[in-house]
Amino acid sequence: MMQVHPFSVTLAPPLQTATGPMRRRQGFVVRRQVGETTGVGEATPLPGWTESQSTCEAALAGDRPLDPTVTPAAHHGVELAALVAEARAAEVPVATLLGAPEVTSVPVNATVGVSTPAEVATAVGAAVDAGYRTVKLKLAGEPTDVDRLAAATGVADDVHIRADCNGAADRPTAISICAAAAELGVEFIEQPLPPSDRAGLEELASLGCPIAVDEGLLEHDVTALAEVGVAVIICKPMVLGGLRRVLRIAAAADAAGLATVVTSSYDAVIARTAAAHLAAAVGGPHAHGVATGDRVVGDIAPDPLRVTEGRVTVGAEAGLGGLTERSYDPGA
């Protein structure tokens, strides 16, 4: 038996995308009974990355098997609800069900938006003061990004700075950004070029700063990415069709010599918490991007994740910690 309930939350500040600011995230809470146990999942389509809201809703209402490559958000929600039910029945956290070692927390990054170099330095300093050891800097894909990188890396010696171009730079600009990043010791540059430019990624990888891909995972498999020198893959479970599919991709990446970073897609609390459990299972040398709850206003349930000294606690409670089928009341 499965129940589906729509929800809408606000993003503050709005998420800047290629098509303009995204001020709200709309999705569906999925309740699914497996045997005697009920689990809760979340399907929150991301425009431009997954199926549309209406397609997701139709997929959840249908009785056909869901394809994670066609309706990834819907598949994520249904699969997660089943995983939570299975974990609760076994009285273990989802992280344990996914193969995580006995960990209680995972390292996470803070995120700093596109702004002036002075504002970047201030924001990075605030993140460091809050205990973060890794900060992700959003870039504009412009020559001025070099100044932003210099400002960010100049704040503290013992903090990892990574940067994300969202595929916005042209090749000459990306070359200057990546060359500067190599000199400044940047952890990695994420999606410096559009996903289609494999030759450009190969050129950038030769400059000395590790290259990560996000959007590129939707167009190329990890073997192809490894062949052009990509070092890190960024995995959004909602976009890739669920936690188990990300685990398979991460295993393939590890075999090819690539590291994996798990990030949320500014989802609501159920999917964010699940992403943290997945990050605990994936592990790896890099901080994960699952500490995005401070951006969500009017969330659908209390957030069980707490960031302390740059880490989020996953916890040992069954399922997703304090999130159960009673965490979200559609009639409230």
Features from the language model and the residues they span:
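Shared catalytic-loop signature of beta/alpha-barrel
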Residues: A58-A59, R64-P65, A199, E203, ...
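Residue-level recognition of alpha-helix initiation/capping sites
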Residues: A118, P143, P172, P195-S196, ...
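Catalytic beta/alpha-barrel core
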Residues: G113, R133-G141, H160-G167, L184-S196, ...
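N-terminal capping/lid subdomain adjacent to the active-site entrance of alpha/beta enzymes
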Residues: M1-I161, N166-I175, A179-E183, L207, ...
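Conserved beta-strand termini and adjacent loop/short-helix elements that scaffold enzyme active sites
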Residues: F7, T111, D164, D214, ...
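Flexible, glycine/charged-enriched surface loops at secondary-structure junctions
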Residues: V94-A95, F188-P192, S264-S265
